[in-house]
Amino acid sequence: MFRGIYETTIDAKGRTSLPAKFREVLVDVHGDDRFVITNSAPVDLGAGTFSSGLLIFPYAKWVEFEENFRSSKGLTSAQRNSIMRTIISPAVECCADKLGRLLIPPHLRKGAALERDILFVGVMDKIEVWSQAEREKVRIQDLKNFPSDSETVAELGL
């Protein structure tokens, strides 16, 4: 499982470092140092504004996602096309070098507004990548959407 939030930077050419803990999970848990990086689904911030980060999937999890997507029946044609254009088409297979460095392609950096200060956020079986400013906007939206009744939260074991 990917857990934790790690602050780092990205340079003008898109070079950054994947946190060591996340590299360990890729190899030790998923048995593969390859991963796929792509756009995340847009987060509706209200008033017609959206925020988007990036997602990093272990390679096997990405293949599983593609298989599930191909066999899914509950999507409209428009939803299917939107997911293909937003998430599947821009996806890039990557591998960090021995020092943990990776290169995030320009088309993904631009869509996620990654310029300097970024966050790697562990979310169970995937990793989110955010600009710090965009992540703060989404965090505020998450607080608004957080279950307000203690019963729902207690069911989760919190």
Curated annotation (Swiss-Prot):
Disulfide bonds: none annotated. InterPro entries: MraZ (IPR003444), MraZ_C (IPR035644), MraZ_dom (IPR020603), MraZ_N (IPR035642), MraZ_sf (IPR038619), SpoVT-AbrB_dom (IPR007159), SpoVT-AbrB_sf (IPR037914). Keywords: Cytoplasm, DNA-binding, Repeat, Transcription, Transcription regulation. PROSITE patterns: SPOVT_ABRB (PS51740). It is found in: Cytoplasm, Nucleoid. Coiled coil: none annotated. GO terms for molecular function: DNA-binding transcription factor activity; transcription cis-regulatory region binding. GO terms for cellular component: cytoplasm; nucleoid. Residues 5-52, 91-134 form the SpoVT-AbrB domain. GO terms for biological process: negative regulation of DNA-templated transcription initiation. It holds the Pfam family MraZ. Belongs to the MraZ family. Forms oligomers. PANTHER family: TRANSCRIPTIONAL REGULATOR MRAZ. This is Transcriptional regulator MraZ. It comes from Geobacter sulfurreducens (strain ATCC 51573 / DSM 12127 / PCA).
